[in-house]
Regions:
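Conserved catalytic-loop aspartate of Hanks-type protein kinases
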Residues: 282
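Regulatory alphaC helix of protein kinase catalytic domains
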Residues: 144-149
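Activation segment of protein kinase catalytic domains, centered on the conserved DFG
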Residues: 192-208
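Conserved short submotifs of the Hanks-type protein kinase catalytic core
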Residues: 170-184
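Protein kinase glycine-rich loop
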Residues: 105-116
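Short beta-strand micro-motifs within the conserved protein kinase catalytic domain, predominantly
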Residues: 161-173
């Protein structure tokens, strides 16, 4: 991939400085002390067969130190892993960008393998996901490479755009994606400054997410996200939504549809039970996101441990209840009927009952949109009735229109 400046060589690490012996206290040379004291010390050493201080220091330096790490050896090992896993991969080299074209500004998040940094690439705002130094292993680099190769082939308005990757320094193994101003949906829903309704802008974010997932499932073979949740849905300044974070995403295969991955609160029951799953696992996770959109709260926020007044249920207990007791997040009392119906179908224990994302998009654009408009009109009528029934006119309160309309 292109860059904004010429490609530069990797920066070498700065070697550790080797310091000489520390002078004696007060800056005096050891031989500049009192002569009688020196003779006394020499006599004491001869009596105890104790070697001079310098000889003891030499012996100490010759002893192996089990706590010492050979920095060059560590560096060479890292370099070998990176070159084996990344440099030799021609597909990844096509996505490489110059790290010098990136300007890192501030850390805005963290994950299991690295940190999320806001920055710019050639002056354009971007998100940089950089791998932590102590996470540079063959397995993690393989996952890193898999995610890059997957994102390189994804092109859709509701999928976060991949820009490039860089590993020209072993401390700067990272990949770059577009920056969305409002952050993730999890934060958006819990920000008290955001006055959200289904009419504006929840329905749009829901449809956008469904379209992005429908695109992933339309691939040949289908791509199963396996970690769909509100934290992996990013929101733009205009309330558009895009699916992100494909670290656990895989093309559908028999071998890989048996492994348990993802975040517990959004996991479908078949994955918890260790059963084979399909792309309908993502549909279940989307159903949990619907509950978040309805309540603006974390899933299962109201579930308490049995026999305890305010104690929360442990994660393992919660997962057991989801898998074997059909536990699902609760919805609000004001939840629209169409949303409640869609939620129940998405979170059904029977995978065949769950709709496809193409069907979800159609349902949202028709049934949910109609009910949203009806509810919005009802709310407007209530507001108008309250205003018409007011005993005090705006003029009496000193409020006057600045514009007069004439025929």
């Amino acid at each position: 991939m292109g860059g904004c400046s010429s490609k530069s060589d990797p920066k070498d690490y700065i070697a550790h400085e080797t310091r000489g012996p520390v002078p004696a206290e007060g800056g005096r040379h050891p031989h500049n002390g009192d002569s009688s004291r020196d003779r006394s010390d020499a006599s004491r050493r001869r009596a105890t067969n104790d070697p001079p201080a310098q000889e003891r220091a030499d012996r100490s330096n010759r002893r192996p130190n089990n706590n010492t790490v050979d920095f060059q050896e560590f560096k060479d090992k890292e370099k070998n892993v990176v070159e084996t896993m990344l440099e030799s991969n021609k597909g990844l080299r096509m996505a490489e960008i110059n790290f010098n074209d990136l300007k890192l500004q501030k850390i805005i998040g963290a994950g299991a393998f690295g940190e999320v940094i806001k920055g710019t690439y050639c002056g354009t705002p971007v998100v940089v996901k950089r791998m932590l130094r102590n996470k540079i292993t063959e397995d993690n680099l393989r996952m890193f490479g898999d995610e890059i190769q997957l994102m390189m082939n994804l092109r859709h308005p509701n999928i976060v755009q991949f820009i490039g990757a860089s590993w020209n320094s072993y401390s700067n193994i990272c990949f770059v994606t577009e920056f969305l101003e409002r952050g993730d949906l999890f934060a958006v829903l819990r920000n008290p400054e955001n006055h959200l309704t289904w009419a504006k802008p929840i329905l749009r974010m829901t449809i956008d997410t469904s379209r992005g997932m429908a695109y992933l499932h339309s691939m040949k073979p289908p791509i199963i996200h396996r970690d769909l949740k509100s934290m992996n849905i990013l929101v733009s300044s205009t309330w558009g939504a895009k699916v992100s974070d494909f670290g656990l995403s895989r093309e559908k295969s028999v071998d890989e549809t048996m492994s348990v991955t993802g975040t517990p609160l959004w996991l479908p029951p078949e994955m918890i039970r260790g059963e084979r799953y399909t792309e309908k696992a993502d549909v279940y996770s989307f159903g949990i996101v619907l509950a978040e959109l309805d309540t603006r709260k974390i899933p299962y926020h109201d579930i308490k441990a049995k026999g305890a007044r305010n104690k929360k249920v442990s994660g393992s207990t919660l997962m057991h209840m989801v898998a074997y007791e059909n536990l699902r997040p609760s919805l609000s009392k004001n939840c629209m009927n169409s949303v409640r119906d869609l939620y129940k179908r998405c979170t059904s224990d029977d995978q065949s009952v769950r709709p496809t994302f193409e069907e979800i998009v159609q349902f949202l654009e028709n049934d949910v949109r109609k009910e949203t408009l009806v509810r919005a009109n009802e709310e407007m009528n209530v507001i108008e009735d309250e205003q018409n029934n007011s005993d005090v006119s705006p003029e009496e309160l000193g409020v006057h229109h600045a514009t007069r309309y004439v025929d």
